[in-house]
Design a protein with these regions (language model features):
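Basic/aromatic-enriched alpha-helical hairpins
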Residues: 7-67, 84-86
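Catalytic-site neighborhood detector that most strongly recognizes the C-terminal catalytic loop/helix
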Residues: 114, 171-175, 185, 257-282
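DNA/chromatin major-groove-contacting recognition/catalytic segments
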Residues: 122-126, 178-184, 188, 192, ...
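Short, polar N-cap/turn motifs at the start of nucleic acid-interacting alpha helices
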Residues: 159-166, 229, 248-267
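Active-site/catalytic core of tyrosine-dependent DNA strand-transfer enzymes
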Residues: 164, 183-228
Length: 291
């Protein structure tokens, strides 16, 4: 086949894709907006690198917030495109995959951003006034449980054990089921929205079986209280910081957050310094007072 547009390729690829990760569709749509009716044989590594560079710098509207992206986020975006082109090769539309020659320029991952106590209260108050009535619930759950955005958006009422204050996460980043505790402050608000059945808690008003796109009320809330350089994912970092500074060990924190690697949790090690100092002070003072 001499002439196949990128749009035709993506539509064909998506129609046969059987994965469960909804973000895959969003990333495919991102690439569709970048190349659209461009013939696939005319797309070169330099074209892909240009798009990814702008995406990494947060200069492209569309998928995700308009903020600098981490290396891993950029690599995931590239991976989707590579899979699309691999499909084209399998269908004999292409001989080579232009995405395989693209190199991601290494940049330091963004420093984790945590909400201060004042920022947290201002943000939660702004979310109470959002046009979407579950904005406050979503943010409160993110802060108090440390769940990922995808885990929250895939939560169903049938996943919530109100009696024990637990959520069963069937759709996690690591592909493993996880039981997550829900603190009383969040559980009480969940009860206010409680519905019978197994529907999504955070559903789209256009399709009850699809998660809501909450970016607009989220960004409005951030802008309203003038909180800058903050991503929704940073609510997870905020939850981790509260756990560690509250005395949870790094292992316990990793268990709650669902980290597969202890190395991931070690990024919060510096936050436990104060807790360790207080613990050492308390124990040693007790030891030497007994002498």
């Amino acid at each position: 086949i001499e002439f196949v547009t990128f749009k035709t390729l993506v539509n064909e690829y998506i129609s046969q894709w059987t994965g469960k990760d909804d973000s895959y569709y969003l990333r495919s749509a991102f690439w569709l907006s970048a190349f659209n009716d461009k013939p696939i044989k005319s797309i070169k590594p330099r074209h892909i690198e240009k798009v990814l560079a702008k995406y990494a710098d947060g200069k492209i509207n569309g998928y995700g917030s308009n903020m600098p992206k981490s290396n891993n986020t950029v690599l995931r975006m590239k991976s989707v495109l590579s899979s699309i082109f691999q499909y084209a090769i399998d269908k004999n539309y292409l001989d080579k995959n232009p995405a395989t020659k693209v190199r991601i320029k290494a940049v330091p991952n963004q420093i984790e951003r945590f909400l201060s106590e004042d920022e947290r209260e201002r943000l939660l108050n702004a979310c109470k006034e959002a046009s979407w009535d579950r904005m406050h619930l979503l943010v409160l759950l993110a802060i108090t449980t440390g769940m990922r955005k995808s885990e929250l958006l895939n939560l169903r009422w049938s996943d919530i054990n109100f009696e024990d204050g637990l959520a069963t996460l069937n759709t996690t980043k690591n592909g493993e089921k996880r039981i997550n505790p829900i603190p009383t402050v969040a559980l009480d608000e969940l009860k206010q929205h409680r519905e019978v059945g197994s529907g999504l808690i955070f559903f789209s008003r256009y399709n009850l079986d699809k998660p809501i796109d909450f970016r607009k009320p989220w960004f409005i809330a951030l802008e309203k209280v003038q909180i800058t350089d903050f991503r929704f994912h940073d609510l997870r970092h905020t939850a981790a910081s509260y756990l560690v500074m509250g005395g949870a060990t790094l292992h316990e924190t990793g268990e709650i957050l669902g980290h597969k690697s202890e190395q991931t949790t070690k990024r919060y090690a510096h936050l436990s310094t104060g807790h360790k100092s207080a613990l050492s002070e308390r124990v040693m003072n007790k030891v030497f007072k007994n002498k």
